[in-house]
UniProtKB/Swiss-Prot annotation:
This is Circadian clock oscillator protein KaiB. The kiaA gene has been eliminated from Prochlorococcus during genome streamlining. It has been suggested that the central oscillator in Prochlorococcus does not have to be as robust as in other cyanobacteria because the former live in specific niches of the Earth's oceans; they divide exactly once a day and at the same time. Thus gene loss and changes in kaiB function compared to other cyanobacteria, can occur. NCBIfam families: circ_KaiB, PRK09301.1. GO terms for biological process: circadian rhythm. SMART domains: KaiB. It comes from the Bacteria. The keyword ATP-binding does not apply. PANTHER family: CIRCADIAN CLOCK PROTEIN KAIB2, KAIB-LIKE PROTEIN 1. Belongs to the KaiB family. Pfam families: KaiB. It comes from Prochlorococcus marinus (strain MIT 9303). Component of the KaiBC clock protein complex, which constitutes the main circadian regulator in cyanobacteria; it may modify the ATPase activity of KaiC. May be a metamorphic protein which reversibly switches between an inactive tetrameric fold and a rare, thioredoxin-like monomeric fold (KaiB(fs)). KaiB(fs) binds phospho-KaiC, and perhaps clock output effectors.
């Protein structure tokens, strides 16, 4: 099995609002359960650092951006749906691909063991 990738994420919020805090809590729960030890999360308050939001072309909050590994992906708005967050950032796809790769290798081995009718 290959080493796990490191995920670099940025969460853009607007102040200490209930919506911002809910987005942060949900995201931290997802990351700690699914990616413990292989992620870095930077929380950016666009009210305190508007230049960062402008540089990254952030127009709405909350916005979650996966910076690494490429490609960059963004989710804008509600982050309460775990599956939506993982799919939107291509994180669930990576997880499923690794699981399926293991299964595909087993299927290939099994197919090779089956004798053809010609033999």
């Amino acid at each position: 099995m290959s080493p796990r990738k490191t995920y670099i994420l940025k969460l853009y919020v607007a102040g200490n609002t209930p919506n911002s805090m809910r987005a942060l809590k949900t995201l931290r729960d997802i990351l700690e359960n699914e990616f413990r030890g292989v992620y870095a999360l930077k929380v950016i308050d666009v009210l305190k650092n508007p230049q960062l939001a402008e540089e990254d072309k952030i127009l709405a909050t909350p916005t979650l951006a996966k910076i690494l590994p490429p490609p960059v992906r963004r989710i804008i708005g509600d982050l309460s749906d775990r599956e939506r967050v993982l799919i939107g950032l291509d994180l669930l796809y990576d997880e499923i691909s690794e699981e399926m790769l293991g299964s595909a290798e087993l299927d290939t081995l099994a197919d090779d063991d089956i004798a053809s009718p010609d033999s």
